[in-house]
Amino acid sequence: MLRTTVGLNRRALLQGAAAIAGLTALSSSAAASATSSGPPHQSPIGIYRGGTQQAHLPALHVHYPHDATVTMKYIREDADEPDGCTVRGDEETVRAELPPGTGSLEMGGVTYGLVQFHWHTPSEHLLSARDYPIEMHFVHQDASGHTLVVGVWVRPGRTNATLGSLYNHLVSECSTADHVGHIDVGALLPRRHTSYRYDGSLTTAPYTEHVQWVMLTDPITASPRQIDRFRTMFPTGNRRDVQDINDRVVLSDRGLL
């Protein structure tokens, strides 16, 4: 949960409120493709700590299950290709799907159901021009179909037991789905939920815009062996290149909590 503990001066508060209002207005619009009018608002982007605007942001209330059964699936982009089962594509990944109603996130009075989470290597979002070995995306949707993605960077360090359980069931391309039980989804998030937030898009086709992005500032850790386990599936990576930020503002409550 995110709570406000430090006051801002009136100018900063007004700037933050205006930026939040703009971000909320965009996210409440009907989903649109990258061909909509105006400059593209695509993801991922490069985030610079000194280039973000600090603001008191709506709290995140995360309700992820601690004993879930997920379905591990390989997501393909070349199903029509004769050699597709042996070729790795940039937009392919392994995805963990959850039954409806299994997990949710509340932000700004709106409830978003957790649909699935997946991984990219190296990370798609950069932090101060640096990438991480892995980035996780937790994909949510509200009752109106609006999308919110929580991103989590993964750095080398201590073993993550939950990640290890999932990576023991990574399914290869063209193989059948695998069901994994007793997954503590909440253990895949850092303890602190400070974040960088901006309006962007899906990072795979059809690159739909007006996606709310919440990149948590703190990474989680995984052992080098766990990281290598996922990387071996995508030796050339499976991330999209960083996109132009254009006229967008990245908000952050880092340092305010």
Feature roles, as predicted:
Residues 2-28, 32-257:
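Alpha-carbonic anhydrase
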